[in-house]
Design a protein with these regions (language model features):
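Membrane-embedded transmembrane alpha-helical bundles that form the catalytic cores
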Residues: 1-402, 406, 410, 414-452
């Protein structure tokens, strides 16, 4: 379900009102019905697969809990892993080998397969007891705010909240949702117009155009993905459920290691807990640490898509992270804190992240290398002037207005709002509504980037 689609915008307030009108013991029925309904609107053909993985992992978890021997438990775990990873590989990567058999990628499959698999693994490790109520487990898998693009929630965090009878609406959800819609409609979709034009024709791009497109895409993917996460967090908060925060100002990072603590936090934690640490983490020497790091980042790239340029993006991050670790004494514990040193670290981190984004956004590795090779090309004043004019006055105004209002918004609604923040919220909300109606009128609604993963 696309959060900017009319169906969600019109039906979510109805679901919200009904949710708080129902007795607590019946709310799960409404939420499960709404979750499956929202999913069916966007991907009706994928509903049986979602149901199959839900039933399969539910049975596997119960099987592990009932098994008396370790062999039987491993068999149940293996069945769940084959089900989740097998379905993910079939629908996401089968096209690499059989281009004559087109398979539509089910919405959210990369997210809910990881979420259900981590649940079964935690049962196997003895960290929690299985959820025996099939309805609550189905809701855990399909909870609509985070089903399609995360955050990837742990059962220990989400299931108790779904069971809770005394949930309360968190009004900060409105703030989160307005912020998320603003990031998507005012910033991400606006930046996408110029970015798409440059990446569509890399051979014709000038140096200024490549640089500007690279910077704008860094903003676009952050605004787009964090915008979705903000809407998800906000919608869940209004339903009395607290989701994990997926982003923590990643472009404020002063190292690549710091960047990955702040970017797509739920996925980073998943790979850390279920791949990196089981492989040995950093406990088995330098060589093993390097191998484990590269495995995690290559898998992360592959998770994003069945294309070489995604794998290269992951490999670039893994290699740069290892190089940074090797060149940083004492793990970076003794950093210089002068203004110049701090600025240099931020600039270095942002520059490397932006270079890696070129591989992520380009249609192929060759296109990415071509775009990077054109960075030094044609930096004349006339080309620079033409590039800036090609963006247009209206998009620039939307970017500036949206960014300014977002900056003035408070992080949360816990503190007493200032007149400035109230004005920013009202202005941003009105602008978002206008932008939403504009997209409906022009038919230019863009899906969130991470829907394709």
């Amino acid at each position: 379900m696309n959060f900017t689609a009319p169906a969600f915008v019109l039906l979510f307030p109805i679901v919200l009102a009904l949710h708080w009108m129902l007795p607590p013991s019946r709310r799960w029925v409404l939420l499960l019905t709404a979750s499956l309904g929202f999913y069916a609107v966007g991907s009706p053909q994928a509903l049986p697969l979602l149901a199959g993985i839900t039933l399969g992992t539910y049975a596997a978890a119960l099987g592990i809990a009932k098994s008396k021997t370790q062999t039987a438990k491993k068999l149940w775990l293996t069945c769940a892993a084959v089900l989740c990873i097998g379905c993910l590989c079939l629908f996401k990567y089968a096209g690499i080998f059989r281009t004559d058999v087109p398979l539509l990628l089910p919405a959210g499959i990369s997210f809910y397969t990881f979420q259900t698999l981590s649940y079964v693994i935690d049962i196997y490790r003895g960290r929690l007891m299985p959820e025996r109520h099939p309805g609550y487990y189905a809701l855990f898998v399909s909870f609509f705010p985070q089903l399609v693009a995360g955050p990837i929630e742990r059962s220990t965090a989400l299931l108790p909240q779904l069971h809770a009878q005394e949930r309360r609406m968190d009004s900060s959800g409105w703030l989160w949702m307005v912020r998320g819609f603003a990031k998507k409609l005012l910033l991400a979709d606006t930046a996408a117009v110029f970015v798409d034009s440059v990446y569509a024709s890399p051979t014709d791009a000038s140096g200024p155009a490549v640089l500007l497109a690279t910077l704008l895409f860094a903003g676009q993917i952050y605004w787009d993905f964090s915008g979705y996460s903000d809407i998800a967090v906000g919608a869940a908060a209004l339903l009395g459920v607290r989701l994990s925060r997926n982003f923590d100002h990643p472009y404020r990072a002063d190292s690549l290691r710091d960047f990955w603590r702040r970017w797509h936090i739920s996925l980073t934690r998943w790979f850390t807990d279920y791949v990196y640490i089981p492989l040995g983490g950093s406990r088995r020497g330098t060589v093993r640490l390097a191998v484990n790091t590269m495995v995690v980042f290559l898998l992360s790239g592959l998770w994003h898509g069945a294309a070489l340029h995604f794998v290269v993006w992951g490999g670039v991050h893994g290699a740069l992270l290892l190089l940074e670790k090797a060149l940083t004494p004492c793990g970076g514990k003794h950093k210089a804190h002068t203004w110049t040193a701090v600025c240099l670290r931020h600039a270095y981190t942002f520059s490397l992240v932006c270079i890696a984004w070129v591989f992520f956004r380009a249609a192929s590795v060759s296109d990415a290398l071509l775009l990077l090779s054109r960075l030094p090309v044609d930096w004349s004043l006339s080309t620079l002037h033409t590039t800036l004019l090609s963006i247009g006055i209206q998009p620039v105004a939307e970017l500036v207005l949206g960014a300014l209002c977002l900056h003035l918004l408070p992080e949360t609604s816990s503190a007493a709002p200032s007149p400035r923040s109230v004005l920013a919220f009202c202005l941003l909300a009105l602008t978002v509504v206008a932008a939403w109606f504009s997209t409906l009128h022009t038919g230019t609604t863009n899906a969130f980037i991470y829907f394709q993963f």
